[in-house]
Amino acid sequence: KDSATTIKSLEGKYFLEFSKYTFNKQVEIENPEYYIQSDKLDYFTKTEHTFFSGPTKIVGEDYDIYCEKGFYDTRNKEGYFTRKSKINYSNRLIEGDSLTFNDNSKFASASKNIILTDTLNKTIIKGDYAEIFKAIDSAMITKRSVAIKMIEKDSLFIKADTLFAICLLYTSPSPRDTVR
């Protein structure tokens, strides 16, 4: 059905009734927009949905995802991941007990035991729920939220019910914006 996608595996079965492939051992899905590597994967041809268990890695243009159980819609590039799930967006790592992800809207959310690590700004934010908006470089963290900023040889801790991490892009004012 999709000539751009190639699936490889050491073992595979096709279930005609469900339009479903079940692959085991060294599963690889290659597509110009993403790459998936898994130990065990079910692929539904009509919906292009994948369900996987065991160590799985999904690589897109600007993200890497790792989990040990989850679902990924290859057509819409969105998914739900559990068990040791992580999303790596450039210099930011999102970890949590469960993660949702949508590449088209550049949005991710994390639930339970979440950790957002920003290696560029040397910041770690923890909590029990987070929403991450990659396109505007911001995040909202609630429920037991704490931010840790590493400053030279020290750390700054900030605790709140809800934390917002927002990157504001600075543009210099034009001469006509000057107030006299």
Residue ranges and their predicted role:
Residues 1-172:
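Structural signature for solvent-exposed beta-strand/loop edge elements and short helix-capping sites
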